[in-house]
Amino acid sequence: MVFMNWKTGVLIAIGLLIGGLLIGWQLSPRIDEVQPLEGGIQGRQPISIYFNRAMDPKSIEEHLELTPPYDVEISWDPEYKLMTFTPVNIWPSGETVIISLSRGVRSKLRIPFWQEFTFSWPVNPTSLVYLWPADGKSNLYKVNPDSGESQQLTNHPGGVLDYSITHDNDQIYYSIAEGSGTSKIMSIDLQSLEKSLIIDCSETLCALPQLSADGERLAYEAITREPGALPGIRIFNLRDQSELDLGVPDEYLENPLWSPAGWLAFYNQTTKGYQFWNPVNDTTRFLPNETGGYGSWSADGRYFLTSEILFVGDTLAPRHLQLYDLVEETTQDLSVGNFLEDLNPSFSTSGLAFAFSRKSLSPQDWTPGRQLWVMDLETGESTSLTDEVDYQHTSFAWHPDGEQMAYVRYNQAMLSEAPEIWLVNTTSGEALRLIINGFAPGWIP
């Protein structure tokens, strides 16, 4: 009887142990799913981990390792079952992001993980986006510079007029041509490639859409069909769908461009100068400028760089680089010498280096084309990256790594020749032709 009681006790103990283990296994935290499930990540694409139990965020952070180390924002759903990683900047192209959770991670019930978890995602290479063909109805394409693999992003019969890439590299805003001189402003999500109608410009020609850095306001150029109407700049509020018309009816406004710091720059053909507007506090500035055209913002939003014509004689009027400091409200001529003409400035995606096109106006050094130069604003040093006298170099687009740059070149000695998009390493000067008959290059993750 004693033997039977002892045997029964052992069986009961084993049963209790098994039951406890089963209960513990059922209550223990596990990872049910990760997103994305497969393939690479790009841009600021979030990574999500779904748990079966409510988790302790502090415990997660103590046992979490991200390789390579990278600044991310970690957010949780209200139930603490969904953890999302969003990079502060775009994921590093060409790297593999690895997220590891070691043993010891606990749930809200203080029950720990029983095993380690490691997940990895390759980061897709940065792609070049461009318009093609230059001699027809152009649409948006992208190409992998390493493999040469290309993909068509849009297929609008009327063609894409122009486009811009958002500051967070998540979307492209672009305008398409419709019948009777009208257009539409569209957007494309660079992760899903889903397209959305933003503004149906049924009575106007809308062009040059530019989204503010905070993603709240879309600036664009609008030309109404009314006789005698001048182009203007409109601001479309994406939150409340309201619209603001900048300027007055008798002013000719063009070329809107948002800074990373939230200022909008645009050119006023009527008053001959650049206007700057901060929508947060309604602050305005004005920079007199006879030349106009496109400018470029520095990565920190402090400097605006453009070109200005200088009258230095009866027959000599070169255009020089004009740097405007929004903090000090000062201007500086960056072009040295009266016989140099500098145009088309484009700041790097980081730091204070910028690209521009230069040609000499002196009779002995004059050439049909303009060459690509790079200048560092901090050191004042400048370097020529091309030396092809017949070619015009323009449309400079810096790679996010700050080392490579795409540009368009035109043969000024043979205007029937198609434009080409080239890629150059700004350190070595090594250049590679990527696209024939394409234009307007830009970079997307």
Show the residue positions of the predicted features.
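Acidic, low-complexity Ser/Thr/Gly/Pro-rich repeat segments typical of extracellular/periplasmic
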Residues: 2-126, 146-164, 170, 177, ...
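Multi-bladed beta-propeller domains
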Residues: 107, 113, 145-161, 187-207, ...
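Beta-propeller folds
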Residues: 126-138, 161, 181-183, 201, ...
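Beta-strand C-termini and the immediately following turn/loop, strongest in propeller blades
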Residues: 129-136, 154, 165, 173-179, ...
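Structural motif
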Residues: 136-142, 180-186, 227-234, 271-277, ...
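Conserved beta-propeller blade repeats
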Residues: 157-175, 201-221, 244-267, 286-309, ...
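Flexible, glycine-rich surface segments
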Residues: 317-319, 329, 333, 337-345, ...
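C-terminal structured domain segments
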Residues: 394-395, 402-413, 417-420
